[in-house]
Amino acid sequence: MEIVSMREMLKAGVHFGHQTRYWNPKMKPFIFGIRNRVHIINLEKTLPMFHFALSELKKIALKKGRILFVGTKKAASKGIKEVAINCEQFYVNHRWLGGMLTNWKTVRQSIKRLKDLEIESKDGTFSKLTKKEALIRSRELFKLENSLGGIKNMGGLPDCLFVIDAAHENIAITEANNLGIPVFSIVDTNSNPDGVDYIIPGNDDAIRSVNLYLKSIMLTISKINNQNSLDKVFIDTKNSTNIE
């Protein structure tokens, strides 16, 4: 059964690209035509490419791999966080910090600092400080949570990235490429598809389109997580029975 249909994609405006003057010629194979000086994306290509991407994400989830969702612009920020949390995965939905992947050792130190501050904010340490010092630490905590809150429990580099807007998140994609981490991305007509392993040609600006992609991914991965949980319960029950 298909997670998403052509009709749903049309309704969500997935086929609307950018104005023709902003196009990237490398996206030509995925363009159906032009309407009112706007490129129209060929959904007959998008639909199977999206379903293929979903099947590959499904394989990663089955192996309990780490999926890092990246979407820092307004249209994607909220949805990226919600889907990652629902899928028990990880996210970056504010500014991408240069070196977030390629300088993981330093990022890990910042994550440790974030966790230390979280403990201090709850165990009464802040209340023992001067108002000025407590304010400084609260601001530091807020800043670190915004930047690293979505990856603080990742425990290592991700097994793949899922990106909304390849052009906007080009630094993240470059870092993943340098480390050999597979990249899944929504790629609009103004973007360069180079560096994206699993291209999904589509509108990356409209909230309805972005939400459709994310909802489909959430449905796919949530089913896998539920299956993994059921398998764990079955194994635990079996082991318990054997012990008895």
Curated annotation (Swiss-Prot):
Molecular-function GO terms, alphabetical: structural constituent of ribosome
Entries under InterPro entries matching the protein: Ribosomal_uS2, Ribosomal_uS2_bac/mit/plastid, Ribosomal_uS2_CS, Ribosomal_uS2_flav_dom_sf
Assigned GO CC terms: cytosolic small ribosomal subunit
One annotated GO biological process: translation
CDD domains associated with the record: RPS2 (cd01425)
Keywords, comma-separated and alphabetical: Ribonucleoprotein, Ribosomal protein
One Pfam family, short name: Ribosomal_S2
Family as reported in the entry's similarity comment: Belongs to the universal ribosomal protein uS2 family.
Protein name: Small ribosomal subunit protein uS2
